[in-house]
Amino acid sequence: MFAFYFLTACISLKGVFGVSPSYNGLGLTPQMGWDNWNTFACDVSEQLLLDTADRISDLGLKDMGYKYVILDDCWSSGRDSDGFLVADKHKFPNGMGHVADHLHNNSFLFGMYSSAGEYTCAGYPGSLGREEEDAQFFANNRVDYLKYDNCYNKGQFGTPDVSYHRYKAMSDALNKTGRPIFYSLCNWGQDLTFYWGSGIANSWRMSGDITAEFTRPDSRCPCDGDEYDCKYAGFHCSIMNILNKAAPMGQNAGVGGWNDLDNLEVGVGNLTDDEEKAHFSMWAMVKSPLIIGADVNHLKASSYSIYSQASVIAINQDPKGIPATRVWRYYVSDTDEYGQGEIQMWSGPLDNGDQVVALLNGGSVARPMNTTLEEIFFDSNLGSKELTSTWDIYDLWANRVDNSTASAILEQNKAATGILYNATEQSYKDGLSKNDTRLFGQKIGSLSPNAILNTTVPAHGIAFYRLRPSA
């Protein structure tokens, strides 16, 4: 086996440069919500957004934290005589303000889309050079979130400085409106966005577009994993490809500014249940936004129970906001049909002194995997409290909603109330501070100094744990 080790330095670049917690007071935890693009692309309408919001609410997902309803590309019909954007009246007959009001009246937040280019990616009017009037359009329509893409940028890229100023123009324009608007950059990680994004935005994409494949290589996503400075980000990037590119970037993200690994593919395509669990777990662990990409009106029971796993979401919404680190990576001989095979261990600190740990199996067969306190607390010195204490192990995927119950909720034969965690009534921060057992998983054992944590991990699957100091 060929080993790769990625241990983050004790003093990260974020610490050196003193990145502020949030440039606009938003994004104190990674955003959660739904975006239409992965499933519907340009097939958008007022009815789709409002029906989807109602369904998210009925399924209890809004109260789990999925508050942003994000309208992606293809909503515009052009500009009016004053240069302001105009919504397509066939798709949105009552206008964007009506959509915003409906969502706000039902305790959602409204997201819209544009591009830092002459056109959007689908060829509609972009905002390059028109940042102030477009920002005012979004504010006038009571928008709470802007996804800002990178197509048709007139060649204004190639150095961090050029890209920074192109995206800063919209950041400044949004702030000038006086309306708090979450600013989500979608420039595919071009020009090292993770270095400069936190000063002007709340999240930033760090790779090409995701596809519903766990490991499959694709020539349209030409850079391999760990090529974090990809000159051509592309699209159709697999889950493992994006995850590996994100591995060294956690030190540049945190409260107020997050690495965005792209929308979730849980419930999209033909991923296995183990692949969907691994995908959701790792996005949660590295503090990526949790944006549902599926059609919530046609979710499988197993996918719904993944989206509603409170103990995993609590890792993502942890107030400390520190992305986990990949501690080790090995290539393995049992490769899958695409010639891919690797195993990894990730670890990261949590706000209340706990630690999150993942053993990820990218091989083609189930296998025993293990780790130790020395690996889990890789920055701790010998004799430290972390390495000389006993830790209780909690399985974060235990107590998952069973398929029968999930199906009953999806078929509206049973209410989600009382079954799912309600973060509207009690935030994840408050639930964690009060030791709400729903957020910690199920205790399965303990790990003492010099002992080994052993488990069997399914192919393309994960073992996902919270470690808590033993009483």
Swiss-Prot record:
InterPro entries: Aldolase_TIM, Glyco_hydro_27, Glyco_hydro_27/36_CS, Glyco_hydro_b, Glyco_hydro_melibiase, Glycoside_hydrolase_SF, Melibiase_C. One of its GO terms (cellular component) is extracellular region. Disulfide bonds join C42-C74, C121-C151, C221-C237, C223-C230. It is found in: Secreted. Residues 1-18 form the signal peptide. Keywords: Disulfide bond, Glycoprotein, Glycosidase, Hydrolase, Secreted, Signal. Its EC number is 3.2.1.22. It is an enzyme of class 3 (hydrolase). It catalyses: Hydrolysis of terminal, non-reducing alpha-D-galactose residues in alpha-D-galactosides, including galactose oligosaccharides, galactomannans and galactolipids. Homotetramer. Belongs to the glycosyl hydrolase 27 family. This is Alpha-galactosidase 6.
